[in-house]
Amino acid sequence: MAHEMKLQTVPHAGGVFGADVDPGIGGIGGSPDGPLNIVHVFWIAGMSCDGCSIAASGATNPSVEDLLLGRIPNLPKVVLHHPVLSPGAGTEFIRPFRAAMDGTLGAPYVVVLEGSVPDDQAFPTEFGYFSAMGAGGFDPESETDQPNRVTDWLWKLAPGAAAYIAIGTCATWGLSLIHI
């Protein structure tokens, strides 16, 4: 299935990172309704070494704790949904991802992709995957026990995201599958 997203690339001031921002969403800087008080960050691990997770968790200026506790002036509180750093697991961890996907989260969100996007289409059946998060399918009536592919999460979260950020070399330049 072919997907098409029309997003604008906004380079980071340092020129190293880029973010794809939907210009139609008030998003990160605020909205006509007032200042932004909270933003959810859905950190999705593609095919990677997790180096950016390690670097972010060890940052000191600002620290990840200051960011998550809302102690940085003029920035909204960040609710981080990270596969390693989040306190929840299983259904509890996946619940906010599903709320964002369904449009019921109640706050703006950003998707951060660490690692390259897997080429799941290389498999001959619908059950193949390289990288997955959660299980049970995306349809509430589904009774499957198959893993939910990272590529499917990315497509499902895209329509409502205020921004998509590819973080690190693997996400920005990495190859997910090498055909020999």
Where are these regions (language model features)?
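Short gly/pro/ser/thr-enriched loop/turn and capping motifs at secondary-structure boundaries
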Residues: 171-174
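Short, conserved loop/helix-junction motifs that constitute active-site signature segments
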Residues: 155-161
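Conserved small/polar residues in nucleotide/adenosyl-binding loops
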Residues: 178-180
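Hydrophobic/aromatic beta-strand patches that form the interior of the parallel beta-sheet core
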Residues: 42, 163-168
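Extended, subdomain-level signal for the structured scaffold at the beginning of enzyme domains
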Residues: 22-24, 29-154
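N-terminal export signals
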Residues: 1-27
